[in-house]
């Protein structure tokens, strides 16, 4: 028996040497079976390549005839273990998965808590148990026993540093847990990482006949793999191919390029000699079929990777490098170059091209979009975690505490998986129909946020409704939607309740973990979750998504495996929901999908840390920045890097040396070898690239690995920009697929669009996709401007007669296009019934309406009743209104009931404020919520305004009308507002504030019907308190905390006529005195100050005329279909249509011209208009 080591550099065809040796051995011994071992990740590709090559060695042509071989079998080490163990006498213990270990270790931490001072504190940290499990697995795989740990602990040392003290405590706890875990596992279980160790023990007691082992593609071996190698080398012929230089064996130093494989070779030779077996060193010479440039690059890195000088007589190479603006531009440029390669070389296949990165994370979000844009099928050869799969989402949300299950986020997360669907007429509800009604239920739940109590109140069906916040009607009105939709929502509601209750019943019945696992599986089957998984699989298969189609089954298998572990290990333990869920989480977090390519010919995108085949023709190495290459590794193991430097020497002093995994620093020292392995993957050409700006927008420098090669060959690093500088540059460098090229064509400046290069590309694209070309090329000329609607469309949307509220006209002047969206197309933002500012204002509004209405019935005013009676009246109305469905959220929780109590107290304060204001005059309320322009008998006539196009009927609702004096000569209009609104002269002139003036005009037309002679004033009344953040509060904080802060001063703000009798009816003031409740103050001579809310009758007539003109202009514009994007400044802050409007001043959009706000300036404009 012997160990044969083939060693040379990456340019040499090691596989040819191994296969030639195997062929010779097979010819010499007809009974011999050769096991050819390759890394697991490249097993399939390697098997195909090995058999094709071996066929040629036997004189056959695999390209023209089928070839099979039973005496040479290609395996990964794990598959070889399985293949040989199944025929051995000793039964392999059960392999425990990570979830089983998680269960055992969790139990140990609970049972031994008093003996684990360090771990008891660390256990509260998220992920600690998982980290501890990983450390225990590493120890077991390396055959490091609790006794080994205690030996290290008991060694005398002069090191009294904090690090040593911490390590001692950690090792003591680790030894206790490891010992307890050994007892729990016994001979029944082994970890997945111990399977090779078990295989090694069986090899020591089992004699295989007529076998030889060949190892290809390895740079080193883990501790369990080394154990297998030791047993094989002691008994059978073993041949290994490793990178290195035989002549330098024994003189290699850490940091040398081939330090790891050469050290591995030495260790293997040492073990072989200990077994009294022969070691043969071979230096193969047959070169791989490589392009000269690849040979030059590999030769260069063999020196540069060790910081040695490289001098090449021939520095001409096909090595290329570029720097892109950012990661998106970089991956686009790579895709573009691949497209160009495919066109230039018709025989080239996508499977011959490899894209590598040291870390693909910055690119994973861009890859799907870019590859679709360039029409390149690809296989992303990285681990895809299971944690985001719908089945995982379903399970983890279902296993939340019962009180959380009916929350909006949880319900929608469960339903949107598509795995919990109603089952009718012998089949699941189709996905399309199901998600349609789920979207309606989503809207309802989002709007109402019902708690579990509301869910279960089946006497009150879930009815889709909207809350209107129109300025002319602030009442929340419930509007029934389509009856069919409501019925389907209610059906889905009952299905959800039934499913959740059934699950909770199962969980309540479960006394042990075994029962819980069983009942959950039964529940999933009862609600046809398995059928839903298969349905999703079939849909994905039909769409050609072969890889994704298996994901559901893989997650199900992972779940059942985890449940099996729970039953086997903790089956008789008392069921605890949180522990049960934590075990499932641990299982899913460590699980990944098995990647299966969708196509035979597709691009491979992978990471440099993953073993790759070395028969790709082209390599694109992306992301080569200083921060990514070499990788900046950090150890997350329980025994950290600093502690490993203490532990490792002690372990190697044993008679049988044992090894922990390398520290992060040791792994980083191997980055030069990892990069060399990436370079060996290509046979023709290599392209290096990196982004100037990383994914976070930070400036990136070139990787030192890249820089050494670039400098050695004097390579020009081309700069790739997101936009071609000229049309010639576009034609030369930016041509890819039709779609991608069109995306670049549209970026060309107008000055370059008449060049022959631009026209040639345009004509070429026009032949295949003329419509897309026209649409895309017109995009830069797009102006964010509206077009005038056709008359027939205007009539269809608005009718021949405009029936509208004054707030709608105001919204037109604020933002014409938003008016069209809201009132023409009837667009609405997503329904919500949260208690926002508008909702609270609506509530206050309704309360005061009810209070004043009762006073009118009793022919009283606010001043005629006591404060206590008023407060009781407010409380009664508040209770009545909050009992309505629109305010049901105020009854849902203790917090919301406290909010209701707060609103009631605020209402009382506001009512008392209005009562104090009422005591300064003799005003008497005559009407509340008085409608005009509505089609009912109680409504006052509409305000009718004629335009050349049509007649406009204006409607509205006067919140309150007071008779201001005992003679009932003057009336006063009161309009409640949630904010402290004042009369804005500039907005009134522009048509953005017409409400008071229009209500004034409408009421004046119906003065006789209202029982007054004339309207003397119209005012806004603020009915919601101002909210301040604590940082804006300027008063006494201690008084605020004691609840002693006085409420803000209540004041009516608006407009009134300068008639002395009316002014005196508001409040009788002496000369020099000011009103507390009105913006009204007299000078010493009896005249009013200019800042009073007063206007002369003459000026008021001009203002009313301007108001009518505004109504006519807006109406005419609406009926003419004129809805320009011309918002008033500040109006976009409150519109829900910003995504539709896409207003951007940087692109030329303009606000309306500002009008002066000063009263005197507006009066000058009015008089000028009149002249």
UniProtKB/Swiss-Prot annotation:
Give GO terms: molecular function aspect only.
5'-3' exonuclease activity; ATP binding; double-stranded DNA binding; helicase activity; hydrolase activity, acting on acid anhydrides
Cofactor names from the entry are:
Mg(2+)
Biological process, per Gene Ontology: double-strand break repair via homologous recombination
**InterPro entries assigned:** ADDB_N (IPR049035), DNA_helicase_suRexB (IPR014141), P-loop_NTPase (IPR027417), PDDEXK-like_dom_sf (IPR011604), PDDEXK_AddAB-type (IPR038726)
Misc: Despite having helicase-like domains, this subunit does not have helicase activity.
Q: What does this protein do?
A: The heterodimer acts as both an ATP-dependent DNA helicase and an ATP-dependent, dual-direction single-stranded exonuclease. Recognizes the chi site generating a DNA molecule suitable for the initiation of homologous recombination. This subunit has 5' -> 3' nuclease activity but not helicase activity.
Q: What HAMAP family is this protein classified in?
A: AddB_type2 (MF_01453)
* Self-association and partners: Heterodimer of AddA and RexB.
Q: Which family does it belong to?
A: Belongs to the helicase family. AddB/RexB type 2 subfamily.
Which named protein is this? Answer: ATP-dependent helicase/deoxyribonuclease subunit B
Which lineage? Bacteria, Bacillati, Bacillota, Bacilli, Lactobacillales
